[in-house]
């Protein structure tokens, strides 16, 4: 009632959501965009507009949003001349003007303008974009904008985990990100905010637990409970352990990489052995399957352990493994048994090593040093956000490359080209008709069809 202005801010946020099942769900970034626009009473193209009272009166006080804010996407248009003769219309290149403003000189490197005003895209536009000085400068400016951001997050979150004001911190971090993005073109700051918010959901829960239960809760271990079926009923049972704050996998990846690598190598070899065994079965000929029927299952797609072991044991009483020529039934059985035995040993070894690593992880968490805790919290809280934020420039550049490629493909094949291809195909088909034979009626029909193809 006391406002100086009588304008009404109308916002169309109907495009800002994600699908959640059957429902449309606003993300934190969508909500933040709405709040900021309303707070600033800002005019944003295709999103919001300050509408005068007089304009509303002229519309008989009809407040239907599309009357005032058109959020629809521009329809795709097709240039008649370009469709007939090729080339890319200047106005369609102009539609990418935000990129040309952000990357000076790039447009001229990508397109050769012909005397008729239409352009041709140069070869390998993706490589031109990737190597252009303005694009490289954009990437470097973005990287510099976030110099020290990891240290900033560490100081605010990790170093002050017991005292940081959780309810206020997300907004402080948001303002820092927005400040860093000032002057960086093309970046949607609300996409960056969404990345922060998604990570903050995890960080804030951890911070609240640390402040509620004390710093030592970081060293706490809890039973890992899972729901399993027992006698037809769901029952919660313990399946190992888990860190209350620090997940086991982060501890293992950060503090015991050699042990994790050793298990990964065993798992890789197990996968290879199982592949080789499957490939061995798949390569069997029908004759092989007949000769090996005693050691194969009814579907002939797997070896049976007991008869296979028995047959190989008999073979080894009278000969050495290397005595058998590759491809013989004896060689195949020995190879299959060796692969099965190797797989069995690998599975046992992997299971034992994983149990040892889990036990070591549990003991390690319980005696973590302050330095180790800082390192692990950095890995859980900060590194995922830094990784997401660092992907923004490449996403923007990929979008531009896709748009240029689409423009190039749109008019690459003209109607004249298509007509030529059709005529060529019709001519080839008409030629093939001459080689066909049939009854008099069939030949008459083929002759008429050939006439149609010839356009006579």
Task: Tell what function each PLM region has.
Residues 1-248, 262-263, 267-269, 276-285, ...:
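A conserved structural/catalytic subdomain of Rossmann-like adenosyl-cofactor enzymes
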């Amino acid at each position: 009632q006391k406002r100086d202005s009588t304008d009404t801010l109308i916002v169309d946020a109907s495009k800002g959501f994600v699908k959640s099942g059957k429902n449309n769900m606003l993300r934190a970034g969508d909500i933040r965009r709405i709040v900021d626009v309303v707070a600033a009473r800002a005019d944003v193209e295709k999103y919001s507009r300050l509408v005068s009272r007089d304009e509303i009166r002229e519309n008989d006080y009809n407040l239907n949003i599309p009357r005032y804010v058109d959020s629809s996407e521009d329809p795709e248009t097709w240039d008649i001349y370009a469709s007939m003769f090729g080339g890319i219309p200047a106005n369609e290149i102009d539609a990418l003007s935000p990129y040309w403003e952000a990357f000076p000189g790039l447009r001229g490197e990508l397109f050769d303008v012909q005397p008729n005003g239409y352009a041709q895209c140069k070869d390998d536009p993706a490589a031109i974009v990737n190597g252009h000085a303005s694009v490289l400068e954009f990437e470097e400016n973005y990287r510099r904008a976030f110099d020290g951001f990891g240290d900033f997050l560490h100081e605010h979150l990790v170093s002050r985990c017991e005292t940081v004001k959780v309810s206020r911190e997300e907004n402080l971090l948001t303002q820092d990100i927005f400040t860093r993005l000032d002057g960086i073109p093309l970046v949607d700051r609300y996409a960056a905010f969404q990345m922060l918010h998604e990570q903050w959901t995890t960080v804030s829960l951890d911070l609240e637990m640390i402040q509620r239960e004390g710093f030592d809760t970081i060293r706490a271990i809890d039973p890992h409970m899972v729901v399993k079926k027992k006698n037809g009923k769901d029952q919660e049972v313990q399946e190992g352990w888990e860190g209350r704050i620090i997940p086991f996998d982060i501890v293992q990846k950060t503090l015991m990489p050699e042990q994790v690598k050793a298990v990964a190598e065993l798992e890789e070899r197990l996968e290879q052995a199982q592949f080789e065994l499957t490939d061995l079965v798949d390569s069997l000929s029908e004759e092989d399957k007949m000769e090996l029927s005693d050691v194969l299952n009814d579907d002939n797609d797997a070896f049976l352990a007991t008869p296979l072991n028995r047959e190989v044991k008999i073979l080894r009483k009278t000969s050495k493994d290397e005595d058998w020529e590759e491809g013989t039934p004896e060689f195949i059985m020995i190879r299959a048994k060796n692969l099965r035995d190797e797989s069995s040993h690998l599975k046992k070894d992997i299971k034992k090593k994983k149990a040892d690593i889990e036990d070591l992880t549990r003991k390690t968490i319980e005696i973590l040093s302050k330095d180790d805790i800082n390192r692990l919290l950095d890995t859980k809280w900060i590194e995922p956000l830094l990784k997401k934020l660092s992907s923004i420039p490449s996403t923007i550049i990929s979008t531009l490359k896709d748009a240029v490629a689409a423009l190039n493909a749109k008019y690459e094949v003209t109607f004249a080209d298509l007509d030529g291809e059709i005529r060529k195909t019709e001519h080839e088909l008409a030629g093939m008709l001459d080689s066909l034979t049939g009854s008099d009626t069939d030949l008459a029909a083929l002759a008429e069809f050939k006439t149609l193809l010839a356009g006579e």
